[in-house]
Amino acid sequence: MLKVKILRLASGYGLPLPSYATPKSAGLDLYAAVDSKLVVHPGGRCAVKTGVALELPDGYEAQIRSRSGLAANFGICVLNAPGTIDSDYRGEITVVLSNFGSEDYVISRGDRVAQMVIAPVERVEWEEVNSITATSRGEGGFGSTGT
């Protein structure tokens, strides 16, 4: 199991550290470290602090993703999903949420607002060429394999 250093910031005292909901969950729930209720109006967005900072090992990233229940039931989504936390970032993990629903959504301290997946990252070295191998799909893009 990968060990990751985590720093609980002052705003995160009293909140759980990011945690897996089930033994086989891929994502860790992130908790809102807000001092007072935060209202996200329909069409609006907000930045939600989580009260934690990470020291990811080289070769890893943290991906910030929407929680499926918030997205399906309330239209609350991570705006830049997946958001990437690089291994050299040391600031507080902050989640940008958007309300694509039709009603105000209230975020309270300790609410689970997003999921975080720790994933390996492969760096690349470009090999510039004059052509690339043809495939049966070719340049077919959006919708070319069906909808």
Curated annotation (Swiss-Prot):
EC number: 3.6.1.23
Record SUPFAM superfamilies: dUTPase-like
GO biological processes: dUMP biosynthetic process; dUTP catabolic process
InterPro entries the record matches: dUTPase, dUTPase-like, dUTPase-like_sf, dUTPase_trimeric
MF term (GO), any: magnesium ion binding
Signal peptide (UniProt feature, chain positions): none
Alphabetized Pfam families for the sequence: dUTPase
Essential cofactor(s): Mg(2+)
Catalytic activity as recorded in UniProt: dUTP + H2O = dUMP + diphosphate + H(+)
Recorded metabolic or biological pathway in which this protein acts: Pyrimidine metabolism; dUMP biosynthesis; dUMP from dCTP (dUTP route): step 2/2
Keywords associated with the record: Hydrolase, Magnesium, Metal-binding, Nucleotide metabolism
Residues reported in the UniProt entry to bind substrate: 67-69, 80, 84-86
Protein function: This enzyme is involved in nucleotide metabolism: it produces dUMP, the immediate precursor of thymidine nucleotides and it decreases the intracellular concentration of dUTP so that uracil cannot be incorporated into DNA.
Family classification: Belongs to the dUTPase family.
Protein name: Deoxyuridine 5'-triphosphate nucleotidohydrolase
